[in-house]
């Protein structure tokens, strides 16, 4: 048995090495495929989505003028969002990772289009494994409160000067401030540097753009009612110093230089529009552009409206088709208006002039698709660790569902979100989900139960679903009991263990099956051989010192049940040769025992060196094969089946006259040459799995 363990260990190491090599190869191949996929995606491009964000630092907010760029319908983690948030904090407001760690509060809120939101602590460094779709995000708001240090006294001495930026007539609300030390004497040169800095960071206007602009100036409005206009292009400064406490606000005005393209721009007509989606209206900040041929028909106008609906609000043709309401209203400068239905394919032949249009209002109310697809929020708690309500279970079609349908969806999200499959659920200590209804009632369902609930329920009545799983580690679910096997007085060391389940009490009948299984597997002794054995029993040693002997040949079992945890070890004892004494005496009188050493892969004394032959003076290779196979099976548990599965099993027989012969034990037939068993000097067996 020791030798079999040695061979098995060597084989396992070889398989591990081979598997490791395959794994590395597969990993490299997968990595290469990923690179190819990435490069392919990069080559073909992704549809992008812009998500607006705001930054509030110490209560001072910034207007929504910037957006975070993501791939449309991309599954991202909160770690990905956090990286982008930290990047814009550093770029826009100069707040580094160290500043965040030392801050009093640092968080960001993800606002979803379904009205829910999720607050994430930037200082925690803990991220859930949930993935979210970028198309579900409406906006992101970032809030940082710097920690009050000793320097706060100096911070209190600072003064905030509000400013506005107007570029080509488009003004920005006063939502940001320039920071100066209170009552500090500064020059207009210092002021200009600050102005140029906010122009670059807020509106992307560089020094080169300022030099090429038609006009670039800023006006300093003082608290005493006076003001001072400074030309940003002049480069000439007065030597006057001003007190920061005297400044009321600063107005920045830039007009970009008109190039040749301005002629084409003049020819274009800009029509402002607004979009009302499910009652939520966006400000009129964008325009529909019409070419230098201002006459257009309503079909072209509808195409432009559908385009901005998709780009601005993500409303596609399919969404419009299922919408309850989808139309736009064209307001003319003469006071008239025209309502056009977006789902209608009938258009009037009238042409309209872009200059006559005052504005366009788009109204969409999603309808039948929203009703056909219902969403129920859910949480997952695994071993007490819960995820927030960030995801929903999606139900399609019929408004009524069964608990069986819900169970399938719950198992699906468990596998997708937390990697818990059917096997893990089967061995879990607890696996349930609770359906909370809007009327305050709730229903707990066991995920491992095979009893079907026939009740049907309306999805609209479900408030939320809480999933709770407590995994029982596989090691704790099973116990391993050491055992020994003694056949005809030859015992094996305690090298193997019986695997028994901890989940329930067991009886001796259950233990019998396990013992018979290892007897057949380890020593090749089946039920028939046990039946004809002289003795077949096993002894159960308990940890409290007691023992129990069980007869393997008996079909009568005590009804006692006991815990696997109480078993210390099991000793199995089998004595074969159950033929009658007369037959045994006859065999012993005829058979002659011949001794010669046998080694396996160079190891000696691992099998018997005594063999009984009926006719030792005339044996063939087939007779020797049979004896060696029997010795391998009884002494080392290497059965004929194992030999058949081996890569190579041969032996070399050495004779006393100096000759030798190679024999393949896997071969069915050997030569019929006769020789004497007493002429054998030794046998060397080589086995390779």
From Swiss-Prot:
Keywords: Repeat, Signal. Pfam families: MAP. It comes from the Bacteria. MAP repeats lie at residues 45-154, 155-264, 265-374, 375-474, 475-584, 588-689. Residues 1-30 form the signal peptide. Both native and recombinant protein bound to labeled vitronectin, fibrinogen, recombinant osteopontin and fibronectin. It was also shown to be able to bind to a 15-amino acid synthetic peptide of vitronectin. Map could affect the severity of arthritis and osteomyelitis in mice through a T-cell-mediated mechanism and could play a role in abscess formation through a T-cell-independent mechanisms. It could potentiate the survival of the bacterium by modulating host immunity. Each MAP domain contains a 31-residue subdomain that shares striking sequence homology with a segment present in the peptide binding groove of the beta chain of the MHC class II proteins from different mammalian species. This is Protein map.
């Amino acid at each position: 048995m020791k030798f079999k363990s040695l061979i098995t260990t060597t084989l396992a190491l070889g398989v591990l090495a081979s598997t490791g090599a395959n794994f590395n190869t597969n990993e490299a191949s997968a990595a290469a495929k990923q690179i190819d996929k990435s490069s392919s995606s990069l080559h073909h491009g992704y549809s992008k989505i812009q998500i607006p964000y705001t930054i509030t630092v110490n209560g001072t907010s910034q207007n929504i003028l910037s957006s975070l760029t993501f791939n449309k319908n991309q599954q991202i983690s909160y770690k990905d969002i956090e990286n982008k948030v930290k990047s814009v904090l550093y770029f826009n407001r100069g707040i580094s990772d160290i500043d965040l760690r030392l801050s009093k509060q640092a968080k960001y809120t993800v606002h979803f289009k379904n009205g829910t939101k999720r607050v994430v602590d930037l200082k925690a460094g803990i991220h859930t494994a949930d993935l979210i779709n970028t198309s579900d995000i409406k906006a992101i708001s970032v809030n940082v409160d710097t920690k009050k240090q000793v320097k706060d006294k100096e911070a209190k001495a600072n003064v905030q000067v509000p400013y506005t930026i107007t570029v080509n007539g488009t003004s920005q609300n006063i939502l940001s401030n320039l920071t100066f030390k209170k009552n500090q004497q500064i020059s207009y040169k210092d002021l200009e540097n600050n102005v140029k800095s906010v122009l670059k960071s807020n509106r992307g206007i560089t020094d080169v753009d300022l030099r090429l602009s038609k006009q670039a100036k800023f006006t300093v409005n003082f608290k005493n009612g006076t003001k001072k206009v400074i030309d940003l292009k002049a480069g000439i400064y007065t030597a006057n110093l001003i007190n920061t406490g005297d400044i009321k606000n600063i107005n920045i005005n830039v007009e970009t230089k008109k190039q040749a393209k301005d002629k084409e721009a003049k020819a274009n007509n800009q029509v402002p529009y607004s979009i009302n989606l499910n009652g939520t209206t966006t400000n009129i900040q964008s325009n529909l552009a019409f070419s230098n041929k201002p006459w257009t028909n309503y079909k072209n106008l509808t195409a432009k409206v559908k385009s901005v609906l998709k780009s601005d609000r993500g409303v596609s043709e399919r969404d419009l088709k299922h919408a309850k309401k989808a139309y736009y209203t064209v307001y003319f400068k003469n006071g008239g208006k025209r309502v056009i239905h977006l789902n209608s394919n009938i258009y009037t032949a009238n042409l309209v002039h872009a200059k006559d249009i005052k504005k366009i209002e788009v109204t969409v109310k999603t309808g039948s698709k929203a009703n056909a697809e219902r969403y129920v929020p859910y949480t997952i708690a695994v071993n007490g660790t819960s995820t927030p309500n960030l995801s929903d279970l999606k139900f399609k079609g019929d408004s009524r569902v069964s608990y069986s349908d819900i169970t399938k969806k719950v198992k699906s999200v468990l596998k997708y979100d937390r990697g818990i499959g059917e096997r893990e659920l089967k061995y879990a200590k607890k696996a349930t989900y609770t359906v909370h209804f809007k009327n305050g009632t709730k229903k707990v369902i066991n995920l491992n139960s095979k009893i079907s609930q026939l009740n049907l329920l309306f999805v609209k009545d479900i408030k939320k679903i809480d999933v709770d799983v407590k995994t029982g580690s596989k090691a704790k679910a099973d116990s391993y009991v050491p055992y020994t096997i003694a056949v005809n007085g030859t015992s094996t060391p305690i090298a193997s263990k019986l695997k028994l389940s901890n989940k329930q009490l067991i009886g001796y009948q259950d233990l019998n099956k396990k013992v018979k299984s290892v007897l057949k597997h380890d020593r090749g002794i089946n039920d028939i051989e046990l039946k004809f054995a002289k003795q077949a029993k096993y002894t159960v040693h308990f940890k409290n010192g007691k023992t129990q002997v069980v007869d393997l040949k008996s079909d009568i079992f005590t009804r006692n049940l006991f815990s696997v945890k109480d078993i210390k070890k099991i000793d199995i004892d089998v004595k074969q040769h159950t033929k009658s004494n007369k037959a045994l005496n006859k065999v012993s009188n005829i058979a002659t025992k011949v001794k010669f050493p046998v080694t396996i892969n160079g190891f000696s004394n691992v099998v018997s060196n005594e063999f009984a032959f009926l006719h030792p003076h005339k044996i063939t290779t087939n007779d020797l094969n049979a004896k060696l196979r029997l010795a391998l099976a009884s002494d080392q548990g290497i059965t004929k089946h194992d030999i058949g599965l081996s890569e190579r099993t041969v032996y070399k027989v050495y004779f006393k006259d100096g000759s030798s012969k190679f024999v393949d034990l896997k071969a069915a037939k050997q030569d019929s040459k006769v020789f004497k068993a007493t002429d054998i000097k030794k046998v060397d067996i080589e086995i390779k799995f």
